[in-house]
Design a protein with these regions (language model features):
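A short, charged helix-loop
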Residues: 40-58, 65, 69, 73-100
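Active-site loops and adjacent core secondary-structure elements that bind or stabilize anionic groups
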Residues: 13-14, 88, 92-162
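Single conserved hydrophobic/aromatic residue that forms the stacking wall/gate
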Residues: 1-10, 15, 160-167
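Solvent-exposed alpha-helices and their adjacent loops that cap or buttress functional pockets
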Residues: 7, 27-33, 52-53, 63-64, ...
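Short coil/turn connectors at secondary-structure junctions
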Residues: 11, 32-37, 57-60, 66, ...
Length: 167
């Protein structure tokens, strides 16, 4: 059985401002230490369902539950916690930590946006797979679609946006 430990999520979610006495007292009472950086690689659901003739049981087994919980709780508390879901950022983050000793708030916010997009795309892949495999029952009320950025473009959008086609 898998279990999500409240103390672990609490370590990510705690508000660290000294004037938030309630959070500080709860952390001390439960022996919770704050976490500054969370790195999560979700179960390979999309890679699993891309295999020919994948069994439903294999697909279901590769739906991550605890990982998205960790990602979302860290992303929500980006004022204090950095969340990394993309291994391409590892070297850049290590460089920042060596130089500054921490990740700057604007970078943590950018990582949080990427993390929420990552879990949304992950959940979209699950819904789309299940909708194609299990044809009976109610249809989800929302239509979900997720696209990966293919490249940056120089022209094609409003001045304050960054144009990029999606695949």
């Amino acid at each position: 059985a898998y279990e999500i430990m409240p103390s672990l999520v609490g370590s990510e979610m705690c508000i660290r401002d000294s004037d938030n006495a309630e959070h500080q007292a709860a952390m001390e009472e439960h022996g919770i230490l704050p976490i500054d950086l969370v790195v999560v690689n979700l179960y390979p659901f999309r890679e699993t369902i891309a295999k020919p003739n994948v069994a439903l049981e294999d697909a279901i087994e590769n739906i991550d539950i605890g990982g998205p919980t960790m990602v979302r709780s860290a992303a929500k508390n980006n004022a204090y916690v950095g969340i990394v879901v993309n291994p391409d950022h590892y070297d850049e983050i290590l460089g920042m930590l060596r130089t500054n000793g921490e990740l700057m708030q604007d970078y943590r916010f950018a990582l949080a946006k990427e993390a929420f997009a990552h879990t949304a795309a992950y959940d979209t892949a699950i819904v789309n797979y299940m909708s194609g495999v299990i044809g009976e029952g109610p249809t989800p009320p929302e239509y979900l679609s997720a696209y990966e950025k293919v490249m940056d473009l120089r022209y094609g959008c409003l001045l304050y946006t960054s144009p990029s086609p999606r695949d």
